[in-house]
A protein has these predicted regions:
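Membrane-interface helix-loop junctions and terminal tails of multi-pass membrane proteins
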Residues: 1-215
Length: 215
């Protein structure tokens, strides 16, 4: 569900590269459709709020409503700081994902893994959420931004009212962070565990060797 995680798994966990682009397209499309569904269900409330507070859709004041669909930064942090926040929190998330899915580290598996990941996301949201909205997922941010742009917010949905288009931060920050997090895990932790990275490839190679030996 996260293009940043998909790309990191492709680079460091032998995820099939043929699935990367279809996965990312599906993830963005899913987020776009989810935003459209929310807008359709709450349409009357959007209109009523705008009329009550005299908000013109597409203005800077309308960003509060656009924030229902995607993330926008705290007005007191700059572009570079926002990028750093998204990069760091996604690196932490990616490191935990690899730790929980690594066969060699002996951590609890099964139904406990999603719970631990969910708890980490909750902690990140509570601690770093006020800074950038903790996107950590290019699909869940860019897909809804595209919908908001089409639904009347226009350019402001992508720029966030800033000189440098803000959509670049939650689009590329998590990708860079996930890659760095996966690299750090493989470099400093995974390499010391009694487990190879590409288990699937090893199994395929072993099966092929056995098949050739039987011929």
């Amino acid at each position: 569900l996260n293009p940043a995680v998909t790309i990191a798994l492709w680079l460091f966990a032998c995820f099939d590269k043929r699935k990367v682009v279809p996965f990312i397209i599906s993830q963005v499309a899913g987020a776009f459709c989810a935003a459209a569904l929310v807008y359709g269900l709450y349409y009357n409330l959007f209109v009523d709020f705008e009329q009550t507070h005299h908000i013109v859709r597409g203005s800077v004041e309308s960003l509060d409503l656009a924030g229902i669909f995607s993330t926008y930064p705290n007005p007191h942090i700059n572009f570079v700081q926002a990028f750093a926040v998204e990069m760091v929190i996604t690196a932490i998330l990616m490191g935990l994902i690899l730790a929980l899915t690594d066969d060699g580290n002996g951590v609890p598996r099964g139904p406990l893994a999603p719970l631990l990941i969910g708890l980490l996301i909750a902690v990140i949201g509570a601690s770093m959420g006020p800074l950038t909205g903790f996107a950590m997922n290019p699909a869940r941010d860019f897909g809804p931004k595209m919908f908001a742009g089409l639904a009347g917010w226009g350019e402001i949905a992508f720029t966030g009212g800033r000189d440098i288009p803000y959509f670049l931060v939650p689009l590329f920050g998590p990708i860079v962070g996930a890659i760095l997090g996966a690299f750090a895990y493989r470099k400093f932790i995974g390499r010391h565990l009694p487990c190879d990275i590409c288990v699937v490839e090893e199994k395929d190679s072993t099966a092929a060797t056995q098949q050739n030996a039987s011929l």
